Amino acid sequence: MEHNVVIAGFGGQGVMLIGELLARAGMEEGKEVTWLPSYGPEQRGGTANCAVVVADEPIASPLLTEPQAAIVFNRQSFDKFEPVIEKGGLLVIDSTLIDRKASRADLDVVYIPATDIATELGNSKFTNMVLLGAYLGKINPISIASVHGALSVFLTGKKAALIEVNKKALQAGVDFVNKK
């Protein structure tokens, strides 16, 4: 089994964090993983994306030309990555911030008002976890429990107080896709 995903948005939206969480959780499950970040040329507020591959066998390359899935936080990322997802792939969209529908009928598309859900949980900064939960609710290359474990690696010190609300945000994303 090999699964790959591109995660894309603006810098500061938590794009890299959820990519690192997926990679770390995969490692904790004994899987082969790669995490490849990419940043736009801007110092602040620019685009950022990362590619994550989780596999049972060694991974030939971390580069994704036709990802199986994409999680997109903003319109710019949506416009860039929708055309390159493989046929039958998954596209998870924050419908709070993205004002158009996918143009491809050959994709499984999840429109989730992730920013709205995160705001209801107390802070729009949890949008990344809501989107990750929606992704894991549809395709589970790794378990939610492993992601919970990985949270404690990245949220340390004062940020450790945010672990429980991040778990709630993950679950809110899972619940959203499972209701449909």
Predicted regions and their residues:
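Active-site cofactor/cluster-binding pocket
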Residues: M1-K180
